């Protein structure tokens, strides 16, 4: 659902309703048509048939995945294509375990910042359940003071965390990721001299999503794995978790590679499991979500279909529209300009399309892309392992962008 197009349609409908009402007041009594009047009546113009969106084939996808993997020195690539609210194609290339286990569409990777989309979907579920107010001060959920001392009258909210405008200082310290430490930082010590919620305060913030995940857990009084699992993952047949060791089929976990060497081993991932205490820690909400490209594509398909998957409404259209709603001021970051949504991004003119919603992710040699076209409902999710990390003109990792170009504009 394109937020701006929806607003335009609503305005047009209101205008048409107004015109219709005025027409009823001013219309004269009906007059019988004369032969000359009937002859002057123009014939209705046929509605033009829209040009069909080009569709990539399995063979073309396999070729694009293999070519991109080779072009960018990857250890492995997965890709999944969305069409009409469903995942219709999947492809895999390379090694899940170097020189011994071939990558398959079923293997699971830690998908870095694509995790933030999963956190956003968790927020959408709680929004539908009436358990959160995105505009309420975080103190509502933490039960203690949350205040930026530089701007005490501007609340720090779930919405500011989703849009990277919370004004919290980013932190990679493991100790800062504990709920007790986050509570202290939220009381005042963890903020920058930036106005919460102001687009000028935008700064990509992993720590903010750690705090967001803990906040959602406190609101639900459940671990986020349970919130997302019961609300979406289980109904959609997705075996995924915010911690690698919490997936059911751990035999499908694949190590991450960077520079030809293992950067995150399976044994390390197995040590990360869900903590049952809500708000205890936020270690995995910025980048720990673990799944296959096809499984994440199911979640992207849900968004592209306004919350419906295989005929079942799992999210309200209003909750999806909230995630897709852009801030008014565009953001320029790493040589690309986009509209920050919640937490999706929207960029016009990507890969030959009018515009795409998307998110990228990178860590430990993983480079990924989630994207979909709100006008056509098609999209693509790409996971890569061990590739070089150059970016294209849209700020997307070039290996992912090469596959996206092939999907959105197949020859």
Predicted segments, located by residue:
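Ser/Thr-rich, Proline-interspersed low-complexity disordered segments
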Residues: 21-55
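Active-site SXXK
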Residues: 65, 79, 85, 108-135, ...
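Short, well-ordered beta-strand elements
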Residues: 367-387
């Amino acid at each position: 659902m394109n937020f701006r197009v929806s607003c335009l349609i609503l305005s047009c409908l209101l205008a048409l309703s107004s015109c219709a009402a005025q027409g009823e007041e001013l219309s004269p009594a009906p007059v019988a048509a004369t032969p000359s009047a009937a002859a002057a009546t123009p014939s209705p113009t046929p509605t033009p048939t829209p040009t069909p969106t080009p569709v990539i084939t399995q063979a073309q996808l396999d070729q694009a995945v293999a070519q991109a993997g080779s072009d960018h020195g990857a250890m492995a690539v997965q890709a999944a294509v969305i069409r009409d609210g469903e995942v219709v194609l999947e492809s895999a290339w390379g090694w899940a375990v170097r020189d011994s286990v071939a990558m398959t569409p079923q293997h699971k990777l830690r998908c870095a910042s694509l995790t933030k989309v999963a956190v956003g979907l968790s927020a959408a579920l709680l929004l539908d359940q009436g358990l959160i107010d995105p505009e309420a001060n975080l103190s509502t959920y933490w039960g203690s003071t949350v205040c930026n001392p530089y701007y005490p009258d501007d609340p720090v909210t779930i919405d500011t965390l989703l849009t990277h405008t919370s004004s919290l200082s980013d932190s990679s310290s493991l100790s800062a990721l504990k709920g007790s430490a986050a509570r202290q930082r939220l009381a005042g010590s963890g903020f920058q001299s930036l106005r919460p919620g102001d687009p000028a305060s935008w700064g990509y913030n992993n720590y903010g999503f750690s705090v967001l995940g803990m906040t959602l857990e406190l609101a639900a009084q459940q671990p986020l794995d349970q919130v997302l699992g019961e609300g979406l993952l289980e109904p959609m047949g997705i075996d995924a978790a915010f911690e690698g060791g919490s997936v059911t089929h751990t035999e499908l976990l694949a190590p991450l590679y960077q520079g030809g060497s293992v950067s995150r081993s399976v044994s390390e991932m197995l040590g990360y499991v869900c903590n049952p205490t809500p708000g205890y820690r936020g270690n995995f909400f910025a980048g720990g979500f673990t799944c296959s490209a096809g499984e994440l594509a199911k979640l992207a398909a849900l968004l592209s279909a306004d919350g419906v998957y295989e005929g079942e409404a799992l999210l309200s259209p209003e909750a999806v529209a909230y995630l897709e709603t852009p801030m008014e001021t565009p953001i320029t970051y790493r040589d690309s300009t986009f509209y920050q949504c919640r937490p999706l991004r929207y960029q016009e003119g990507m890969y030959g399309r009018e515009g795409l919603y998307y998110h990228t992710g990178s860590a430990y040699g993983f480079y990924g892309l989630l994207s979909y076209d709100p006008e056509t409902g098609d999209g693509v999710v790409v996971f890569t392992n061990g590739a070089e990390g150059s970016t294209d003109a849209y700020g997307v990792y070039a290996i992912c962008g090469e596959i996206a170009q092939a999907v959105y504009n197949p020859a």
